[in-house]
């Protein structure tokens, strides 16, 4: 009988253990968190000065019941915000790893992504222009990621430098790595602009040189520390681009034309300037100047330079000069001289010398751009563009193309794309006020108009395709 009662007592204990008891066994329903990352982007792109906004709450779910949530946003592995909505004022360029941690009292979930803060001026067509009263303007049309061009943005300098007053009479523009150099004749100076943000970084002036009025710059797009700045009177100054100084040039001491040509190959630059006193080419390699007189003068007589441009890519160049109303073409190797096996000069390395019949007459002031790929020179007079092939002994009598969609158009500057497939043309109408500048893009091979942009600048001074 005692065993009977013992069995009943044990069964009772087991029955008690069947009741719910949260204190001994964890049977509470866990409210797990999930983030619908498939509905969110892995990468976000924003331009500088734009804002990234992400409200994470619509993408968060809790499995059992809604519990209070906490949020932690990290940017570049550092705490950024504890709000449910992320706001990033995009100022610093670059790519930043991002993460949000969403938690309740039971669990946490994570969402990771990348934020790319890009320059709105990374790569594209850049136009420097001047109004009737000399006011300068920088316009920019962006190259989009898919290869197509965007729309022109005007007044880029004033917009990105509030309160800064820029000088009048801009004369030239050149890029060196991450910087854009713009020269001004009024209040003579060179302004150094960040090429990606168009923010002012430095102002280079030389009040100690009263005749410093920069009209052209020969500036390599590399890590070179110095460049050539040609003043209005033909005097050359040394532009120390890294230090931001204007110095007297101790090698180029003559008087030079603003017509010049340069390219940068290997370790040394190749500068070709025209000495207006000696009527000859001066070849400057960054260290020494050579006036090409070792075997007698290359040009007999008082030739005046009209154009200097590349002939065969990184191999030869051509000089067009005028003498007594006639135009002469002289093509030389980049090194000017023939060398023997001991690298001694043995004579002038002429590639071609001939008289060119000029109709219409080509002038030094005519906007020009050369294409070594197509072996031709494009030049403009009024609203007409002409194409002259290097092999021809006469200039064309008929235009290659004409700007005829607007009246009274005058072409003021030309440039060519880096791959030489497109010609960029800047024109303006003097009888139109305000933003009276027009940009045209032509196919280099066919002359077909690819696109045109109206009222996107003042009178164009310089046009260039700015690469990254």
Predicted stretch roles:
Residues 14-17:
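C-terminal motif of bacterial Sec signal peptides marking the signal peptidase cleavage site
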Residues 122-127, 397-429:
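C-terminal hydrophobic structural anchor segments
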Residues 122-133, 139, 171-185, 191, ...:
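Short beta-strand elements that form the blades of beta-propeller/WD-repeat-like
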Residues 2-9:
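Sec-dependent signal peptide recognition
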Residues 159-177, 207-226, 248-270, 293-316, ...:
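Repeated scaffold domains used in trafficking and secretory/extracellular systems
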Residues 98, 103-112, 117, 195-224:
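Surface-exposed, polar helix/loop patches in the mature regions of secreted/periplasmic/lumenal proteins
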Residues 137-160, 185-211, 233-257, 276-304, ...:
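Surface-exposed loop/turn elements that mediate protein-protein interactions on large endomembrane-trafficking
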Residues 19-160, 164, 428, 432-447, ...:
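Acidic/polar, low-complexity intrinsically disordered N-terminal segments immediately downstream
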């Amino acid at each position: 009988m005692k065993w009977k009662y013992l069995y009943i007592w044990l069964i009772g204990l087991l029955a008690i253990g069947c009741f719910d008891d949260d204190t001994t066994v964890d049977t509470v329903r866990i409210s797990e968190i999930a983030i619908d990352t498939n509905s969110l982007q892995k990468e976000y792109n924003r331009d500088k000065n734009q804002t990234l906004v992400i409200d994470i709450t619509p993408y968060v779910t809790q499995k059992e019941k809604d519990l209070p949530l906490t949020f932690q946003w990290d940017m570049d592995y550092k705490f950024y915000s504890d709000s449910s909505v992320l706001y990033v004022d995009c100022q610093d360029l670059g790519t930043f790893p991002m993460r949000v941690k969403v938690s309740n009292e039971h669990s946490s979930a994570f969402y990771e992504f990348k934020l790319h803060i890009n320059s709105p001026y990374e790569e594209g067509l850049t136009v420097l222009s001047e109004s009737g009263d000399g006011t300068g303007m920088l316009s920019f049309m962006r190259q989009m990621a898919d290869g197509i061009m965007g729309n022109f943005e005007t007044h880029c300098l004033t917009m990105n430098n509030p309160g800064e007053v820029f000088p009048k009479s801009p004369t030239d523009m050149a890029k060196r790595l991450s910087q854009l150099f713009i020269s001004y004749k009024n209040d003579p100076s060179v302004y150094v602009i960040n090429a990606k943000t168009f923010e002012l970084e430095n102002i280079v002036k030389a009040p100690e040189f009263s005749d410093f009025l920069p009209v052209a710059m020969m500036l390599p797009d590399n890590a070179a520390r110095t460049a050539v700045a040609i003043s209005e009177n033909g005097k050359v100054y040394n532009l120390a681009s890294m230090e931001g100084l204007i110095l007297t040039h101790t090698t180029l001491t003559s008087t030079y034309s603003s017509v010049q040509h340069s390219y940068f190959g290997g370790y040394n630059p190749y500068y070709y300037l025209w000495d207006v006193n000696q009527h000859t080419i001066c070849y400057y390699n960054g260290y020494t100047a050579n006036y090409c007189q070792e075997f007698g003068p290359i040009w007999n007589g008082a030739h005046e330079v009209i154009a200097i441009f590349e002939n065969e890519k990184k191999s030869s160049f051509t000089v067009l000069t005028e003498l007594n109303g006639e135009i002469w073409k002289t093509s030389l190797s980049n090194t000017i001289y023939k060398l023997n096996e001991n690298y001694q000069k043995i004579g002038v390395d002429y590639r071609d010398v001939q008289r060119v019949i000029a109709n219409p007459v080509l002038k030094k002031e005519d906007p020009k751009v050369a294409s070594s790929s197509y072996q031709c020179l494009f030049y403009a007079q009024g609203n007409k563009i002409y194409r002259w092939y290097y092999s021809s002994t006469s200039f064309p009598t008929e235009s290659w193309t004409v700007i005829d969609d607007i009246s009274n158009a005058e072409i003021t500057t030309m440039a060519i794309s880096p791959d030489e497939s497109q010609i960029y043309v800047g024109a303006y109408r003097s009888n139109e006020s305000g933003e009276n500048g027009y940009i045209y893009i032509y196919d280099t091979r066919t002359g077909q108009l690819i696109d045109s942009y109206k009222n996107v600048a003042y009178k164009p001074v310089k046009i260039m395709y700015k690469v990254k």
